[in-house]
Amino acid sequence: MAVQTPRQRLANAKFNKNNEKYRKYGKKKEGKTEKTAPVISKTWLGILLFLLVGGGVLQLISYIL
C-alpha cells in the first residue's frame, strides 16, 4: 500500500465524514409515499354504482316505452 500524501489524507477524511452518516442506516429514501386506504369501501362503491346505473337504465326503459 502506498503512503498517503497530506492532501490525500484530508480528502479521505472528508469522504469518510460524509459517508459515516449513511453507513448505519443507509441512504434516506425520498419520494416514497404511504398508501392510504380509500375513503369509501369497494362494497359501498359497488352498491352506489348499481343504484345509479340501475336507476338510469330504468329511466331509459320507461322513456322508450
Curated annotation (Swiss-Prot):
Signal peptide from the UniProt entry: none
GO biological process: endoplasmic reticulum unfolded protein response; protein secretion
Species assigned in the record: Saccharomyces cerevisiae (strain ATCC 204508 / S288c)
GO cellular component terms, semicolon-separated: endoplasmic reticulum; endoplasmic reticulum membrane
InterPro entries to which the protein is assigned, alphabetical: ER_stress-assoc
Protein name, UniProt field: Protein YSY6
Job of this protein: Interacts with target proteins during their translocation into the lumen of the endoplasmic reticulum. Protects unfolded target proteins against degradation during ER stress. May facilitate glycosylation of target proteins after termination of ER stress.
Alphabetized UniProt keyword annotations: Endoplasmic reticulum, Membrane, Transmembrane, Transmembrane helix, Unfolded protein response
Similarity-based family: Belongs to the RAMP4 family.
Superkingdom to which the source organism belongs: Eukaryota
Localization annotation: Membrane; Endoplasmic reticulum membrane
